[in-house]
């Protein structure tokens, strides 16, 4: 009888320990998840031989095939351009920005733009309202010069902005965003990336990636 009681207590103790271990692992995982959103990112201003879009894409593809995990995003600054709704010819001015690599480093909401989507775009709410009269315009088309884009999503940015995946291979990237690895300072992360890819640049600023597009717009 006493032996059965001991076995029961032992089994109960094992269950309790398993539950506590699972809870501890869950809590640890949640802490790591939360930290991802607060990770500092280096904004590097490139100079010298600016990498063209095709080179930026090649660098990104090379990293995807390697064992080294590095999160980065090249940025092409298209400046303020006229954006048009081809159906009713409504127009507005918007800052056009192209990204190559992990778009979410530019802004979390930029993840709406898939990696190889060269015909899609993400725009801010004000641009959507001025062009389409509504924020619910996903799937609608707009033009910039002779280029036609389809709206993939509308996001909350504080200025007229249009985000794309640049398709013209000769366009050059003037910035790169780099997320430092755990325990690595941003200067080291920027230096390693630049040297490893034969690029020249200077660390301009670092920021918490929740406000990425605002920081870049003010540079």
Q: Residue ranges of each PLM-predicted region?
A:
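Hydrophobic secretory-pathway targeting helix
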Residues: 2-36
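A residue-level structural signature of the nucleotidyltransferase/glycosyltransferase Rossmann-like core
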Residues: 119-120, 141
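Extracytoplasmic/periplasmic regions of membrane proteins
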Residues: 40-45, 50-53, 98, 108-111, ...
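The feature marks short, hydrophobic/small-residue-biased sequence motifs that occur predominantly
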Residues: 73-115
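Membrane-proximal extracellular/periplasmic loop immediately following the first transmembrane helix
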Residues: 28-82
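Mid-to-C-terminal secondary-structure elements
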Residues: 100-109, 125-182, 187-190, 194-199
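Conserved small/polar residues in nucleotide/adenosyl-binding loops
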Residues: 208-215
């Amino acid at each position: 009888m006493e032996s059965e009681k001991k076995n029961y207590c032992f089994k109960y103790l094992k269950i309790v320990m398993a539950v506590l271990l699972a809870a501890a692992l869950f809590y640890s995982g949640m802490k790591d998840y939360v930290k991802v959103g607060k990770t500092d990112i280096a904004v590097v201003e490139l100079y010298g031989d600016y990498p063209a879009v095709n080179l930026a894409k090649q660098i990104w593809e090379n990293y995807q095939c390697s064992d080294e995990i590095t999160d980065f995003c090249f940025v092409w600054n298209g400046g303020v351009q006229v954006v048009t709704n081809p159906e009713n010819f409504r127009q507005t001015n918007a800052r056009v920005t192209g990204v190559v690599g992990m778009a979410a480093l530019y802004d979390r909401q930029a993840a709406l733009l898939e990696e190889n989507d060269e015909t899609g775009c993400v725009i801010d709410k004000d641009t959507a309202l001025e062009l389409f009269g509504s924020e619910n315009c996903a799937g609608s088309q707009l033009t910039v010069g002779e280029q036609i884009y389809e709206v993939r999503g509308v996001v909350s940015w504080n200025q007229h902005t249009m985000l794309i995946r640049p398709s013209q291979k000769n366009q050059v990237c003037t910035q790169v965003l780099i997320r430092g690895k755990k325990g690595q300072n941003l200067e080291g992360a920027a230096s390693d990336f630049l040297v490893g890819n034969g690029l020249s640049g200077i660390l301009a600023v670092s920021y918490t990636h929740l406000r990425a597009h605002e920081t870049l717009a003010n540079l």
